[in-house]
C-alpha cells in the first residue's frame, strides 16, 4: 500500500463548483437529470438564473443556482417561504415551487414555475406617457397591497420594490410577486417569539432596505441607514410612494441627492397627505376619478398614521404565542394595526368606476397597455385558432382526469374484493366448531371405498319417507335402521384398515354415534 496516498477507500471525492461553473451552463443541456436549460436569465441577487423546462416540455420555470456554506444562502430562505405560502393557500399571489435540492453540500438550487405573461417592467415601457391612469394604478394597488398583507401576516417582509419582480398572469389578469429574492424574515415583535430558529435567522441576516436608492425607501431607513429593520408599515409607505410616482409622474425628491433633504421632503409629503383636503362644491357623482384617487391616497396616509399610533401602544403590551395580546375575543390571535380592507376597497371602487357589478368584471377593465384589435379576417382566424387550442387543452386535461379516475376506481374495486374475501374467510373460520376443525384432516386423502359406502348410506337416508309426529312405532323403526347402517359403516371401515375391536355398549366406553343409536343398543340388550 502506498503511504503517500491520502484519503480512505470509503471516502467520496466531491467536485467543488465555482461561480464560473454556475454562470457557464450551456443551453440544451440536462440539469440534475430533470430540467433542460433553454436560456440564461439576468442574475438575481447572488443566484444565477436560467429558463428551463422538463423533459416532456410541459412545465416551464426559472432555475436558481447559488453557492452557500453551512446552509447560509437566500435560496433556503425562499424555499421555506414558498412552502409556507403553498400550505396556507396563497400560491396565487406568488410563484409556485416545483423542485429544490442541494448538490455536493454546497450548491443550492430551486426551480420556480412561471405563468404566461409579461413583467410589470415591460408593461411600464408600453405606456404612451410618463403618467399612469388612476384606473390602472388602482388595479395594481389592489393586487400589490393584498400580497403585502399576506407577507406581513405570515412573518415576511419585502425589502425592495423592483418592477421586474412583479408579473401579470394573462389567464387570470392578476399581478403576482414572481421573484422572492428580496423577501426575508420579519423582525417584528409578533413574529420574533415564534421559535428560536426564526429569531436567530432574523438577527443574523440583513433586514434593512436592500438598495441604496432612496426614491421609494421608507423614512426609517433614511434616518437609521444600516441599523434599519424593515417592518409592515415600511412596506405600506413604500407602496404609497410608488402609487404617487406612477400617477403624478415624478416625486418631489427624485432629483435630490442629499440624504437630509430627502428626509425633510418625505416628512413634509406625508404630513400634507394626512391633512384634510379642501372642500369642493361639486356633487359627489360629478367628482373626477383623479380626485377620487387623491382621496384614496389621503385615506392611505391616514390609515398609516393611525396604525403607527396603535402600534406604539401595543409595543408596551406583553407577548404570548408570537402575537400581541389585546383585550376582547381576538386576545390570542395575531393582529395587524393596518386597515387593509379599507385601503383596498378605496382602490377597488375606483377600478369599478361606479359600474354595476353585473356590467363588467372588474379584472376585465381596459388598462393603459391594452389595445383594441380591429375585427379583420386575420384576427378572427387567430382567435379561432386560439379558442380551438384552448378547447383541445381542456379536452386533454379532462381525458387525463377521467383516466386517473378510472385507474383509481379499479384499484379501489380490487382492494374491496380482497377485503371481502379476507372477511369471508375470517367469518368461516370463526363459525366453524373447534372439534370439526380438529377432526377434518387438511392434507389426508380419503379412501374411495369409504366414500362409496358413505354415499350409499346417505342415499338410503335421503330416500326415507317423512315420519309422522308423536308416533313411537316409527321412531323405533328408525332407530333399528340407524343401528343397521352403523354396523355396515363399521364393517366397511374394518375391512379397509387393520382389524380392531368394536366398542360394545357393555364395556362402558361411549360410542361415537348419535343418541338414536345408543337407544337402539339399549333396546336390543333388554
Swiss-Prot record:
InterPro entries: CK1_Ser-Thr_kinase, EF_Hand_1_Ca_BS, Kinase-like_dom_sf. Expressed in male and female germ cells. One of its GO terms (molecular function) is protein serine/threonine kinase activity. Gene3D superfamilies: Transferase(Phosphotransferase) domain 1. One of its GO terms (biological process) is positive regulation of piRNA transcription. SUPFAM superfamilies: Protein kinase-like (PK-like) (SSF56112). Residues 489-498 have a biased composition (Low complexity). Residues 458-467 have a biased composition (Basic residues). Residues 439-448, 468-487 have a biased composition (Basic and acidic residues). It is found in: Nucleus; Chromosome. Keywords: Chromosome, Nucleus, Transcription, Transcription regulation. GO terms for cellular component: autosome; cytoplasm; nucleus. Residues 436-526 are annotated as: Disordered. It comes from the Eukaryota. PANTHER family: CASEIN KINASE-RELATED (PTHR11909). Nuclear factor required for the production of piwi-interacting RNA (piRNA) precursors. Specifically required for piRNAs produced from loci associated with the Ruby motif. Promotes binding of the transcription factor snpc-4 at piRNA genomic clusters. Required for normal fertility. This is piRNA biogenesis factor prde-1. It comes from Caenorhabditis elegans. The gene is prde-1.
Amino acid at each position: 500500500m502506498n503511504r503517500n496516498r491520502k484519503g480512505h477507500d470509503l471516502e467520496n471525492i466531491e467536485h467543488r463548483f465555482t461561480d464560473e461553473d454556475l454562470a457557464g451552463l450551456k443551453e440544451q443541456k440536462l440539469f440534475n437529470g430533470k430540467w433542460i436549460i433553454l436560456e440564461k436569465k439576468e442574475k438575481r441577487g447572488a443566484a444565477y438564473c436560467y429558463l428551463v423546462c422538463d423533459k416532456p416540455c410541459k412545465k416551464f420555470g426559472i432555475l436558481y443556482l447559488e453557492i452557500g456554506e453551512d446552509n447560509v444562502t437566500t435560496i433556503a430562505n425562499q424555499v421555506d417561504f414558498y412552502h409556507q405560502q403553498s400550505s396556507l393557500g396563497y400560491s396565487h399571489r406568488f410563484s409556485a415551487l416545483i423542485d429544490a435540492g442541494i448538490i455536493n453540500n454546497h450548491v443550492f438550487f430551486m426551480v420556480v414555475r412561471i405563468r404566461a405573461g409579461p413583467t410589470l417592467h415591460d408593461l411600464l415601457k408600453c405606456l404612451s406617457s410618463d403618467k399612469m391612469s388612476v384606473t390602472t394604478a388602482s388595479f395594481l394597488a389592489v393586487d400589490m397591497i393584498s400580497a403585502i398583507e399576506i407577507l406581513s401576516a405570515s412573518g415576511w417582509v419585502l425589502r425592495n420594490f423592483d418592477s421586474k419582480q412583479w408579473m401579470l398572469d394573462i389567464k387570470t389578469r392578476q399581478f403576482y410577486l414572481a421573484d422572492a429574492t428580496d423577501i426575508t424574515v420579519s423582525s417584528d415583535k409578533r413574529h420574533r417569539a415564534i421559535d428560536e430558529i426564526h429569531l436567530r435567522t432574523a438577527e443574523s441576516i440583513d433586514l434593512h432596505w436592500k438598495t441604496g436608492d432612496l426614491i421609494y425607501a421608507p423614512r426609517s431607513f433614511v434616518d437609521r441607514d444600516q441599523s434599519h429593520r424593515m417592518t409592515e408599515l415600511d412596506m405600506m409607505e413604500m407602496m404609497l410612494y410608488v402609487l404617487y410616482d406612477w400617477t403624478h409622474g415624478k416625486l418631489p425628491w427624485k432629483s435630490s441627492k442629499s440624504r437630509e433633504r430627502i428626509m425633510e421632503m418625505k416628512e413634509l409629503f406625508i404630513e400634507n397627505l394626512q391633512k384634510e383636503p379642501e372642500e369642493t362644491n361639486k356633487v359627489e357623482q360629478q367628482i373626477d376619478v383623479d380626485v377620487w384617487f387623491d382621496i384614496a391616497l389621503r385615506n392611505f396616509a391616514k390609515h398609516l398614521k393611525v396604525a403607527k399610533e396603535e402600534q406604539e401602544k401595543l409595543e408596551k403590551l406583553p407577548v404570548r404565542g408570537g402575537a400581541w395580546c389585546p383585550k376582547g375575543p381576538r386576545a390570542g390571535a395575531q393582529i395587524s394595526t393596518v386597515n387593509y380592507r379599507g385601503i383596498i376597497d378605496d382602490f377597488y371602487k375606483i377600478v369599478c368606476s361606479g359600474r354595476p357589478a353585473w356590467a363588467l368584471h372588474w379584472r376585465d377593465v381596459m388598462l393603459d397597455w391594452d389595445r383594441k384589435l380591429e375585427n379583420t379576417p386575420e384576427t378572427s382566424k387567430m382567435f379561432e385558432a386560439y379558442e380551438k387550442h384552448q378547447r383541445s387543452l381542456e379536452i386533454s386535461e379532462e381525458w387525463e382526469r377521467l383516466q386517473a379516475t378510472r385507474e383509481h376506481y379499479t384499484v379501489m374495486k380490487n382492494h374491496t374484493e380482497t377485503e371481502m374475501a379476507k372477511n369471508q374467510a375470517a367469518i368461516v373460520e370463526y363459525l366453524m366448531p373447534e372439534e370439526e376443525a380438529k377432526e377434518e384432516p387438511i392434507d389426508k386423502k380419503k379412501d374411495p371405498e369409504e366414500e362409496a359406502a358413505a354415499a350409499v348410506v346417505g342415499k338410503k337416508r335421503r330416500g326415507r319417507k317423512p315420519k309422522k309426529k308423536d308416533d313411537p312405532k316409527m321412531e323405533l323403526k328408525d332407530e333399528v335402521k340407524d343401528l343397521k347402517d352403523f354396523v355396515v359403516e363399521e364393517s366397511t371401515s374394518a375391512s379397509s384398515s387393520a382389524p380392531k375391536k368394536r366398542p360394545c355398549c357393555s364395556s362402558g366406553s361411549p360410542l361415537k354415534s348419535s343418541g338414536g343409536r345408543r337407544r337402539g343398543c339399549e333396546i336390543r340388550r333388554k
